[in-house]
Amino acid sequence: MIHIGHLIEEELQRQERSAAWLGRKLYCDRTNIYKIFKRESIDTDLLLRISKALNYNFFQCYSDRLNADM
């Protein structure tokens, strides 16, 4: 199973950006970003916004998993 929150947190760290930075990009408080890190799943609209903010296609993770399982 993909834990999307962990993947988002890892990518944010890889880019050397903070939760506060992502919060500003998403117009939410950094405490909400920390809650996102703990989520195993996420709303697609929110994932799209995060993908755009980080310039990273998190949907590809699901696509790769789907292809591997077929």
Annotate each predicted stretch with a short phrase.
Residues 34-35, 48, 62:
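Key DNA-contacting residues within the recognition helix of helix-turn-helix
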Residues 1-17, 21:
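A short, Lys/Arg-rich alpha-helix, primarily the initiator
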Residues 39-52:
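Short, basic-rich loop-to-helix N-cap that marks the start of a DNA-contacting helix
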Residues 27-42:
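Recognition helix of helix-turn-helix/homeodomain-like DNA-binding domains
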Residues 21, 32, 60:
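Residues in the helix-turn-helix
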Residues 55-70:
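Short C-terminal boundary/hinge segments that cap the last helix of small helical domains
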